[in-house]
UniProtKB/Swiss-Prot annotation:
GO terms for cellular component: cytosol. Carbamoyl phosphate binds at residues 59-60, 109, 136, 139, 261-262. Keywords: Pyrimidine biosynthesis, Transferase. It comes from the Bacteria. Catalyzes the condensation of carbamoyl phosphate and aspartate to form carbamoyl aspartate and inorganic phosphate, the committed step in the de novo pyrimidine nucleotide biosynthesis pathway. This is Aspartate carbamoyltransferase catalytic subunit. InterPro entries: Asp/Orn_carbamoyltranf_P-bd, Asp/Orn_carbamoylTrfase, Asp/Orn_carbamoylTrfase_sf, Asp_carbamoyltransf, Asp_carbamoyltransf_Asp/Orn-bd. It catalyses: carbamoyl phosphate + L-aspartate = N-carbamoyl-L-aspartate + phosphate + H(+). Heterododecamer (2C3:3R2) of six catalytic PyrB chains organized as two trimers (C3), and six regulatory PyrI chains organized as three dimers (R2). The keyword Magnesium does not apply. GO terms for molecular function: amino acid binding; aspartate carbamoyltransferase activity. Disulfide bonds: none annotated.
Length: 301
């Protein structure tokens, strides 16, 4: 009986984009679109969802909380600075405790790559809100929804992911699923920050990226994950690898700019472009609520 509950929880949770087929992804996007259009779903009974954030977060944390409250869920907020993990309690024991006191799902962001492998014995769904440099599936889904709203289809689109790819869970979640959905993915940025991506994807210059991309997906320089923060000055990075006003002028009329945020203005993107006509950065944030409502419904229905 317990093994069946664990298997069901695994199926309803969401830890990586790779665990979902294309049809599942499209179904989730369809559900998200319905929520964005005003659809209502409520659980039949009182359900508690615990949000465990072990890393700083604004967009993801509050987006999940808004999604949970719109669905009529009871939200348990976890403060990692004042929790028993500070006394040495393991992530598993913390999660197991929340499961035992009645949490129906756990939303977790953790600095450790693939932390969720340690939680396979739980019988409640785990929703990954970001693991180290590994995965960020709900960010990927909201990015996909934003692209779908713009172009209706993914087939034939050229998406360039640019910036600090080696340290980006967003890049890892997006590159493969975009390819599976029919898009062509290229990468841009310092070759030192490409990690494994140049093994699979074509590396282009930033000027080429601006000219060629239907979707130019800029990534934050993750200074906190670099051993050497002084590899580039902010000004040098912006001129060599950022989206400057001059590069934006090279972009095709229909092309859009995306960024998972937070944005380092005048580093990845010129400040004047953050809210320009082709920017979809705040649309991405707005779409996060509908996407996370869809993911929570899938986990709890």
């Amino acid at each position: 009986m317990l093994s069946a509950q664990i298997e069901k929880a695994t199926q309803k949770g969401l830890c990586t984009m790779n665990e979902m087929g294309v049809s599942e992804v499209l179904d989730l996007l369809k559900t998200a679109e319905s929520f964005a259009a005003g659809a209502v779903w409520k659980p039949r009974m009182q359900l508690f969802v615990a949000n465990l954030f072990f890393e700083p977060s604004t967009r993801t944390r509050f987006s999940f909380e808004v999604a949970e409250r719109r669905l009529g869920l009871e939200v348990l907020q976890f403060d990692g600075q004042h929790a028993s993990t500070q006394k040495g309690e393991s992530l598993y024991d913390t999660a197991r405790t929340l499961e035992s006191i009645g949490a129906s799902a756990l939303v977790i962001r953790h600095r450790q790559d693939a932390y969720f492998h340690e939680l396979k014995g739980l019988s409640v769904p785990i929703i990954n809100a970001g693991d180290g440099c590994g995965n960020h599936p709900t960010q990927s889904l909201l990015d996909l929804l934003t692209i779908k709203q713009e172009f209706s289809s993914f087939s034939g689109l050229h998406v360039v992911i640019a910036g600090d790819l080696a340290h980006s869970r967003v890049a890892r979640s997006n590159a493969d699923i975009l390819t599976r959905l029919g898009a062509r993915v290229s990468v841009a940025g310092p070759i030192e920050w490409m990690g494994e991506f140049t093994d699979t994807y074509t590396h282009v210059s930033m000027d080429e990226a601006a000219r060629q991309a239907d979707v130019l997906m800029m990534l934050r320089v993750q200074h906190e994950r670099h051993d050497d923060n002084a590899l580039f000055s902010k000004e040098a990075y912006h001129q060599a690898y950022g989206l400057t006003e001059q590069r934006e002028a090279l972009m095709a009329k229909q092309s859009i700019i995306m960024h998972p945020a937070p944005v380092n203005r005048d580093v990845e993107i010129a400040s004047v472009l953050v809210e320009c006509k082709r920017s979809r950065i705040y649309k991405q944030s707005a779409n996060g609520v509908a996407v996370r409502m869809a993911v929570l419904k899938r986990a709890l229905a």
